[in-house]
Amino acid sequence: MYIGIDCGTQGTKAIVLDSVQKKVIGVGYAKHELITQSNGRREQQPNWWIEALQQALQIALKQAKNSPHFSPNLVKGIGISGQQHGLVMLDKNDRPLYKAKLWCDTETATENDILIEKLGGQTAVFEKLGIICQTGYTASKLSWFRQNYPDKFANIRKIMLPHDYLNYWLTGKFCTEFGDASGSGYFDVVKREWKREVFKYLAPELNMDEVLPKLLSAEQKIGVIKPEIATLFGFNENVIVSTGGGDNMMGAIGTGNIREGIATMSLGTSGTLYAYTQKPLLNLPPMIANFCSSNNGWLPLVCVMNITSSNKQLMNLLNIDIEELNQLAQQAPIGANGITILPFFNGERVPPLPNTKASILGLDSSNFTRENLCRAMMESATFTLRYGLDLFRQAGLKTSQIRLIGGGAKSSFWRQMIADVMNSEVVCLQEEEAAALGGAIQAMWANGEGELEFLCETFIHLDENSKAYPNLSQVKNYQNAYERYLTHLSQLY
C-alpha cells in the first residue's frame, strides 16, 4: 500500500494505492482557504496544508478500509506533490514567519523586475540559471519579504517550498529535490545546484548552506515518518517518504510523461503544458520554463494563469454551473460570432503580463448573448494554452499525444475543442488524480518496487473512451478565431 498526496491551491487530495490489486482503493479531499487582495496578493497559512492533509488522508484511509486487503499497518510509503513556488519561511522554533505567498501571487512583480535588472537582464539570468525568473517564482517573494519585514527576515532559519514543508512535517528531514527547486529562481537547472550568487543578492544576511534544504535526486527516499505521524494514522514506523516534487513534476509521473514524445496539459485553476526531455534544452524561448523533472531529467513547461478560474468568473456572473456553461457554449458557433476574450483576470505569466487586466472584445448588439460569452470564455482559456504549444513547437519539442488532467478535462466538449485548437490527439487517464498518483508511484520507486518505467506502465492507464481527435473542418475555424485572439494580444505584448 502506498499513499499519494497532492497539496494544490484549492485543496489537498489523498489517494491510497494498492500495489497488489494495482488500483486506487481510497480517495480523500479537503479544501483550502485563499487570502486574496486586488494588488495581486495570493497567500495561504502553511498550517492549513497540514490540517488539510490530515483530513484528506483520514477520508482516503476510511474509504480504503472497505477493501478486504487493506490495513493502515500495510502502508509502505508516501509521496508528496505540492503547488510550486510557494515561499515557506521558518524561525528557529520551526514556526512560519509569515503566510506562504503562492505561485499565483503577482504582488511581487516589481521585485522580480528589479531582480532581473540587478542580475544583468534576462540573458544574464538565463546564463546563470538556465531559466528566466518569472513573477510567480520564489525569488521575488523572498525579496519582497526582506523589504517589507526586515526584522522577521533576519529570523529566517529554513526556507522551503510547499511540498518540502509537508515532507518536513512527516519526517523532520530538511531537504528537497531538483524538480521543485528549479522553480525557485535561485537554482541552476543545468548544474542542478543552488546558485550562490543569486541567493546572496536576495538574502545577503542569510547563510545559504544553512537556510536552504539539502538537495536529493528524485529516486532517493528522504527518511521514514516520525513516530507521532505513525500513531496519528495507524501506520507502522517504517513507512518511507520519497522526495516528492512540484505538482507539475508529479503530474508528469502520474500521466506516464517520463519519456520524450508525450505532453501533459493540466486544466486547473491555472493551465500548464509540459513534456519530458533527457537533457536540458538551452535554446528555449524565455517563456518556456526549463524545469528539472522529478525523475532525474528535465521538464520544459509553460504555465498560464487563467483556465478554470476564468470560466468560474463567468459562471459566477451568469449564476450558472459548469454543465450550463458547457451547454450554452455549444449553442454558439466556433469563434463566438466575433467575440474575443483576453482572460487575464489574474494577470498572465505566458506571455509575461503580471499586471494586465482581462478584456472582452468585439461586442455588438447582435452577438452579446450568454451563449457567445460562454463559448468565447472557453475558447480564450484554450487559446492561452495554444500559445504555449506554439512555443513548444517553435523550440522543436514534438509531441504525438497530449494527456489531459485537471477538472476541465472532464468535459467532452472541452476535450474536443482542445483537440481541434491544438490539432492533436488528446486523452485522459483512468485515474483522475494524476499528481497524487505520481507521488504514490514515486514512493514505490524510492522503496525499490521496480524501475519507474515499469511502475508507470503497470499503474497508469489511458481512458480510451475519452480520446478526441482533431476535426479538420473545425481545426480551420478555430485557427481563424485563434489568429484574431493573437491580433488582440499583440496590442499588449
Swiss-Prot record:
Gene3D superfamilies xref list: 3.30.420.40
Protein origin, superkingdom: Bacteria
Annotated disulfide bonds: none
UniProt keyword Transferase, yes or no: yes
GO biological process, one term: xylulose catabolic process
Binding site for substrate: 84-85
Single GO MF annotation: D-xylulokinase activity
Active site feature: 247
Keyword Aminoacyl-tRNA synthetase: no
Keyword terms of this UniProt record: ATP-binding, Carbohydrate metabolism, Kinase, Nucleotide-binding, Transferase, Xylose metabolism
Enzyme Commission numbers on file: 2.7.1.17
Site feature Important for activity, where: 6
Catalytic activity line of the entry: D-xylulose + ATP = D-xylulose 5-phosphate + ADP + H(+)
Family: Belongs to the FGGY kinase family.
Biological function: Catalyzes the phosphorylation of D-xylulose to D-xylulose 5-phosphate.
UniProt name for this protein: Xylulose kinase
Protein species of origin: Haemophilus influenzae (strain ATCC 51907 / DSM 11121 / KW20 / Rd)
